[in-house]
Every structure is written in structure tokens, then in C-alpha cells.
């Protein structure tokens, strides 16, 4: 059900399955802006709070647009043998874009030749429960850099990175 993937404050439970409510809330004009990236993207900026020995991090932020903090991405690169404790402000979805390693208890590995219908260990979540316990350890167990991309939801940061 699509409504369960939405934030409660955006789509209260009493409006689940209410497609008219969804259509009223949706900003069609903003979603059809063919120049969105040109108007809102910024160069990647260093994420000093997540850098360390053998660990590089960069924010990819589209800033505040339409008067609101909408999205941000953190690219984390852990060199072979490196590890770091990761505890961002907000839960996040992550994708493995290169290498292999461990995120918390989850073994992750990037796959070059994916087959539709197969399950691959390259996508996961950093949950609020994990953050409440101090975050997760990320370790590169492979021979090439472990590249992870964390997607943060809107309003994930107390201050939009780089703004």
C-alpha cells in the first residue's frame, strides 16, 4: 500500500486509500519542472562529521526548494580494511554502489549483473532503533572501496547540509 510509505503528518491514517486527498496534496507543477536539477543542484560538499581514517564522505544536497528541506544524499566511501561508526540525525535508506562489507549486522555487496526477481544484499535501512543505540558500525571487508549512498527523507536534518 503506497500510503504506508508516506509520513503520517503528510497522509494521516484516516486518509489512507483516499486518492482524491493524495491528488490535492501533490504538487504537479513542481514535479513537472524539466529544469529542476539545473535550478536546485549544488556541487557535492565535504561531510566532515562522517570523515575519518580511510573514510571519505560527501553530501549531495538539492537544498531548500519550494520553501522546504526536501532531500539529501550522503555518499560514504570506506577504503579496504576501514571501518567507522555511523550515526546520522535521521533514519535512512542506503544503496551499495561499490565494493563489499558490513553495515551493522547486514553483509552488503555490490552486484554488477543483477537478474530481475533475485534478492541482493545491497540495499538496507539505518533504523531509528539503531540510531537510538548509537548508530551502526560500517566495515569494508573487501579489496576495493565500499561505496554507500544514504538517502535521507525530507526534514531529516536540523540544518540542511551546506546551506
Q: What residue spans do the PLM features occupy?
A:
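C-terminal amphipathic alpha-helical segment
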Residues: 2-91
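Feature targets compositionally biased, intrinsically disordered low-complexity regions
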Residues: 51-53, 100, 123, 133
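Compositionally biased, intrinsically disordered low-complexity regions
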Residues: 54-56, 65, 103, 126, ...
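Glycine- and acidic-residue-biased ligand/ion/polar-headgroup-sensing regions
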Residues: 71, 79-121
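Ordered hydrophobic segments in well-structured contexts
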Residues: 73-75, 92-95, 124-126, 147-149
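C-terminal structured domain segments across diverse proteins
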Residues: 74-75, 92, 97-100, 106, ...
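Ligand-binding loop in jelly-roll beta-barrel domains
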Residues: 106-109, 117-158
